[in-house]
Amino acid sequence: MSQLLPSLVELDQHAQAEPEFATWRVGFGPFEHALETQAAVFRLAHQLVQAGHQPDLASVYRLLQAVDRVASAGLWLVVHMTYARQVHLDGSPLAAEDFKQHPEGHTGGALNMVPAYAGYLALNALTGRTRAWLMGQGHCVAAVDALNLLTGNLHPEQAQAYAGGEAGMNRLLQDFYGYGQAADGSPLAPLGSHVNPHTAGGIAEGGYLGFAELQYAHMPLPGETLVAFLSDGAAEEQRGSDWIPRWWRAEDCGVALPVMIANGRRIEQRTALGTEQGLEDFRQHLSQCGFDPMPFDGRDPAAFVTTLWEMELRLERRVEEKARGILNYPLPMPYGIAETVKGFGFYGAGSNAAHNLPLPGNPSRDEQSRDLFNEHAARLFVAQQELAASLELFTRSRQGRTLERDNPLASRRPPAPTMPKLNYRDDACSPMAAVDRFFVELTAANPALRPRVGNPDELASNRLGGVLKALKHRVIEPESELEAVDGAIITALNEEAVVSACLANQGGLNLVASYEAFCVKMLGVVRQSIIFSRQQKEIGRPAGWLGWPLIATSHTWENGKNQQSHQDTTFCEALLGEMNDMVRVLFPADHNSALALLPSIYQARGELACLVMPKRDRPCYFDQAQAEQLARDGAIVVEEQPGNEALLLIANGSYQLGEMLRAAKRLKEADCAYRLVYLQEPGRFRGPRDHWEVVARASEGVAERLFPDAMEMRVLLTHMRPEVARGHLWPILPDARKCSALGYRNRGGTLDEFGMQFANRASWANVLAACARLRNVPRTALLTRDEAAAVAGKGDPQILRGDA
C-alpha cells in the first residue's frame, strides 16, 4: 500500500503499550501476520476508534484475534466437510469409520475463501455496518457455509438442520455432497455444491466463472456496499470484467469492492496469475483499464479486513475529489488482489490435487491419508472454549445492525412501479414502437427505480430510438446528444456483459434488446439467474426484483440481408425449455399485442420474459380488446369458417400469422372449414412439469375452447424449429398422424422474408400443402398446378410471391 505506515520499531513500541496488539501479531494456527499487515492493522485500529466505530484500540485487536480463531475453525470445518462423516470437538484424531466412503468437495478454493469471508464478517463487526457479498466461484460455498454455521448467520432451515453443536455439524458433513433426495426428487438437504438460496446472504450461484465479474458493479444502489470475491481463472476467461470503471458512477451506484482470490491455479494447471510476471502484468492491465490494484496477503484474514477498509476509504476520497472537480470519470476503482496458494492451510496446498481432494488417497481406507488428515487438521483445531469466546465477540457486534443473511442485496423488493397509459394504435407500424414508448414513459413515471438498458449494438436500428434519446449511452466522453456520462444504456459488443448489467440491477427497471441470433450468447447467464430465482421460490423466499423483457428482434425471418449466422431460433427454443413460471416466451405479432404484454411483465417479481418480435412494420392484427385478451389467455381465435372436418390452423409468430392468413383466404375460397388461432405464449399450453407450471398454464377451459378435440386435423406454423415446438406443444398437437408442424428448418442465407419462408417450407403455400395432406386431397385442390410444382421444388418459387 502506498500510504505511510508505521515502522517495525513503532510497531514494537505499540505492542508494548497495547498487549492485545502484541497477542494478535504473534498469529494463530496457520495465520502469520506480515509486517505490512501489522502496519495496516495499526492504522485501521486508530481510524476505527477516531471514527467512533470502536471504543478503544484493544477492542479492535481482540476482534482480530477472534477472527483468526474463527477462520482457523472454518478451515478445520471445510476439510471435515470434504472428508469426514463426523467431527471430534475435543480435537482427537478421526478413525477410519469417521471418514466418508466417497469424499467430495472443491476443497482448495473453499480453503482460500475462508480467510476472505472471515475478513468480510470481521469488517462488518468492526464497523457496525453490514455489507453484501457476492462470490463468483460459487463452488467454494463450503467456506461460507462453514463460517455461517460457526457465527450463527443462518436461514431458519439451516439453523434447524445444522445448529446445536456436534450433532448439527455432523449433519452438515453428511449432507455435504450427500446426494439426499426428497420424495419428489428435489434435494433433501438445505445445502448445495454452489451458492444457493439456502446460503445465508447468497445472491448468485456463481456456477459460471466470470459472470459475477460482469455484474458486481451494477448490483449495489447508492448507500449500499458490496464485496465481490472473484476468481483469477475468470479473469482469463471473461471479456468485459475489466470494463467496470466505464460503467460505475457514484450518483447511481453503490460501493463495489472487487477482490480477486489469486491462488494461481485452474483445476488442472497453473494460471498466468500463478507467476510473479503474470501478477505484475495483470496489475498493469488493471491500471490501464481504470482500476487501482491493491495486492495483499490473501492468506491472512486481517489483511482482508484492512484492504477492504482501505478500498472503501480510497473510493470515498475519489468521489469527493470528483465532486470538487479534481477528478473525472472513470475514477480509479480499488481492486484487491489476494495473493495466496490453492488450498492454503491444509496438506497439498499449491498442487493440482488441492482443487478437489488434496490427500493422496481416501482416508477411510488409506492409513497414510488418514494420518495426513489428522496431522494437518490438528494444526487448524480451535478448542471449544476459546472458539466460543471468539464467537461471542461476533455475536455482540450484531446488536443494532442487520445480519449478513439479510443484507439489502439479498432482500431486494423494490416498490411496484407506476404503469404508464397504454397507447394502442390501428395503423401498420413496428411492434418495437410499443416497447420504445412504454419504457420511456415507465422510467419517467418511476424516477426512484434505476433504469438500465442492455444494448449489444444498434439500438436505433432495432427501433428503440426514443429509449436512446431519453436514456442515452453511458460513456466517459460524450460525442453526441445520444451519449451522456450518466446515461442508463450499457452498450458493448458483448451480449453477456450488457445482459449482466440488467440481471444485476435488481433494484430497478430493465430492458435488453438484441438480434435474435446473438441472444444465444446470453443464454448461460440468463439461465443461471432464473434457476436461482426458481430455487428461491421453491423454498418459500421468492425473489422480489421486478420482471423485465429480453427482446429478440431483427429476427430469423426478417434478417435475410445477412447470412445464416444471423438466422437462429435457438434462444427462444432454449428458454421455452426452462420453467415457464420463471421465463415467459412470447411472440407478439403486432404493436398492440406487444403493448398489452408489457404491464404484466414489469409487474411480475423474479421472472423474465423473452419477447420474439419483428422490428419491421407489421399490420395491425389485433385491436385493444383482442390484444388484452391475447395477453391474458396466451392465444386467441383470429378468424373462423365453420363447417365439417374443420382444419385447425395455429400461427406462432408475426410473419407466420401473415402466411396463415393468406392460406386461410385460399381455404375460404375453396369452401374448406377452418379455424385460425394465434399462439402468442406457447408455454401456457405445454404439459406442466410441476405444480408451479400448473399455475402458469392458461386458465381453466381456455385450451379446450381454443383447441377443441373435435378439430383433429391441425397445422402449426411456428417461428421456431417445428420439432422443438411440436415437442413442447404435444397437448395441442396430440396425434402426429393428424398434425403437421412447419417452421425453421435451418435453411437460410441472403434472402428476403419470402425467400426465408420458402427455403424453410414455411410459406402460405406449404401450409396449404399440409392441409391437403391432412384432408387426403391432392395439393391442386388448394393450389394451382404451378403453385403445387413450386411447393414440390419443381417450379418457379417466385410464383408464390403474389397475393393468394
Regions found by a protein language model. Give the residues of each.
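N-terminal leader/propeptide and maturation segments of large enzyme subunits in energy/redox metabolism
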Residues: 368-428, 766, 771-777, 786-794
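Cofactor-binding active-site loop characterized by glycine-rich and histidine/acidic residues
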Residues: 63, 67-93, 101-251, 465-467, ...
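Non-catalytic terminal/interface segments that mediate subunit docking, oligomerization
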Residues: 65-69, 75, 82-88, 133, ...
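A glycine-rich helix N-cap at a beta->alpha junction
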Residues: 154-171, 248-259, 288, 477, ...
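Glycine-rich phosphate/pyrophosphate-binding loops
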Residues: 213-227, 506-523, 677-680, 778-779
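Active-site nucleophile and cofactor-binding loops and adjacent substrate-binding regions
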Residues: 98-114, 133-140, 186-205, 231-235, ...
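Thiamine diphosphate
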Residues: 172-190, 201-205, 219-223, 227, ...
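Intrinsically disordered, low-structural-confidence terminal and linker regions
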Residues: 1-52
